[in-house]
Amino acid sequence: MSKKGRSKGEKPEMEMDPVQMANEELRAKLTSIQIEFQQEKSKVGKLRERLQEAKLEREQEQRRHTAYISELRAKLHEEKTKELQALREVLIRQHEQEAARTAKIKEGELQRLQATLNVLRDGAADKVKTALLADARDEARRAFDGERLRLQQEILELKAARKQAEEALSNCMQADKTKAADLRAAYQAHQDEVHRIKRECERDIRRLMDEIKGKDRVILALEKELGVQTGQTQKLLLQKEALDEQLVQVREAERYHGSPKRELPPGIGDMAELMGVQDQHMDERDVRRFQLKIAELNSVIRKLEDRNTLLADERNELLKRSRETEVQLKPLVEKNKRMNKKNEDLLQSIQRMEEKIKNLTRENVEMKEKLSAQASLKRHTSLNDLSLTRDEQEIEFLRLQVLEQQHVIDDLSLERERLLRSRRHRGKGLKPPKKHVVETFFGFDEESVDSETLSETSCNTDRTDRAPATPEEDLDDTTTREEADLRFCQLTREYQALQRAYALLQEQVGGTLDAEREARTREQLQADLLRCQAKIEDLEKLLVEKGQDSKWVEEKQLLIRTNQDLLEKIYRLEMEENQLKNEMQDAKDQNELLEFRVLELEVRDSICCKLSNGADILFEPKLKFM
């Protein structure tokens, strides 16, 4: 009988050992899965750090390229100024030599005239007249020949100088084109590198998502096993109830057998005593075995209840997170639409800038053609007619050029005002009336969330989800949560007030800055116009006073000045184009970051839905039992 009792007592113990081992294995699997999940989170953080490093490297390379281009432009400007200075000195020397030669010629003429006057006073009128006529004819012929040779030489020199200037201008344009091609190639290389990094990151993200899905499937399988174990615990509870009923029946039987009122015959009494002693020993063993089994079942029930409370807390937290992510997705989608619209506007502005650069290059070519056409005008035979017609043509050409420059200045000022107006309207349209602070899953933010805060808050929530909660800790948590909610409301009110004040200040500062810029540009354009008008008047005076000596000098200076103005315009347009490209690249990066966050939020929503479905499956047996 004792062996049978022992075998009966060892059977439930053997049944409970695999249940405990399965629970321990499940716990070990859950801890390993959580560790792997944390490792995957750290890998995602490292990928984000790599993206940030790639962005920093790209910005540094862009800064180096801009510095190198500015240095090359400064060197080119210095070389041009040196060449102009040397040319100016050569021209000054030639002018001084011409002035000395004309002074000598005039002195010789004065001496000759003085001699003729002396001869006339002496009384040889006819001879003097004939001699004077012959001398005058010879002198006029010699002067005409010398002037013709001098003019031909000057024409050749001017043609050579113009060829040199055109070659220098063509070299500059070629250098600018090569620089632009190098910059485009570098930009394309950077874009290819960015796309490659983006593809690698997307590949890693897909791989991580597949791993997370596999781990979700493992978690669902473990939850199913846990549901099976809860069913087994229910069976054990039913067995416990049956054993309790058997204990009650045994105790009633003991009371019935041990009552003194019952009288039995002597033979039957001895047998009853023997049977009673044996039954009493068996009942004591059964009671002890049942008490041990009941204690074990109670411990298992407590553990399962703790696990169910933890799973309920996790389910509530996940539901809360899913609602928060739904709320957070709306502003992110709206912001993505706004960024796409801004990208389209930036592309349109870049196209407009390129068209403007093409127009400026076409105007430069037209000016060159006009200069070449003006140089190929027909020469008149007489020197007086030639000087008069060239003066008139030069003045007319200068007036036309000033009018063209004035039209270009007006067009650029109108274009600038239009761009400023469109930027203001765009800024007002994009600026939200009030930036609401949203309590997101990643913290408190207006619209976007940083990656560092995302990782930190996710780690903190995971740590808080793991810890089991007692009733006293729940009370403390509720009080601390109420205090935190009050503080958060106060902080949000203060933050919104500061944000409104900052928006007002930014609007005031932006308006004054735009007005100051407009006034400054208007003053600069007026000063340029006055300077051009004064230069034209000076040129007209010089043309009237000196004739043809300073025409080609002024012509060359004017050409150099117009070329410098056009180069400055091209440089400004290139700077604006680079700025727009940088803004477009920043917008693209922000768009990619938003897409990555949307992917993360979708993954979290799917995980939350799966966990919520698993938690409902787990809670059904306990609800039935309760």
Swiss-Prot record:
It is found in: Cytoplasm, Cytoskeleton; Membrane. Residues 452-461 have a biased composition (Polar residues). GO terms for molecular function: GABA receptor binding; kinase binding; microtubule binding. The modification Phosphoserine is found at S382. Pfam families: JAKMIP_CC3 (PF16034). It is a peripheral membrane protein. Residues 365-626 are annotated as: Mediates interaction with TYK2 and GABBR1. Residues 19-254, 284-413, 490-604 form a coiled coil. Keywords: Coiled coil, Cytoplasm, Cytoskeleton, Membrane, Microtubule, Phosphoprotein, Protein transport, Transport. One of its GO terms (biological process) is protein transport. Associates with microtubules and may play a role in the microtubule-dependent transport of the GABA-B receptor. May play a role in JAK1 signaling and regulate microtubule cytoskeleton rearrangements. Belongs to the JAKMIP family. This is Janus kinase and microtubule-interacting protein 1. It comes from Bos taurus (Bovine). The gene is JAKMIP1.
